[in-house]
């Protein structure tokens, strides 16, 4: 039985090890390697699925959302950020997740109505945070954007 367990290994730890190795080779100078970006997006999701209680999961999902944005996958990034915001209530970057949802709707997807609702949600849920202040500022500028 021990041989079977050793052969199978701890997949969540090996996934975390893979993430750490990939992060070390992700950049060539200032440029993110596209092949590593794809592998990291998959690995962050794998870790969350394999071991949702792992302490790195919220940060990994946040990094995955960032990679989705850099890949131009804005709708997927919005879903990832919403899931992270709603699924990890103790995550310290929740206000930033909510703000980024609004920002993506505003700047990348150019949907002023969804952006407005998302900015208002940040203000309501995260009062007193820098993200709430940025949301209020963004709302003031929203009607003036082309």
Q: What are these regions, as identified by a protein language model?
A:
Residues 4-146:
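Acidic, polar-rich low-complexity tracts and alpha-helical solenoid repeat scaffolds
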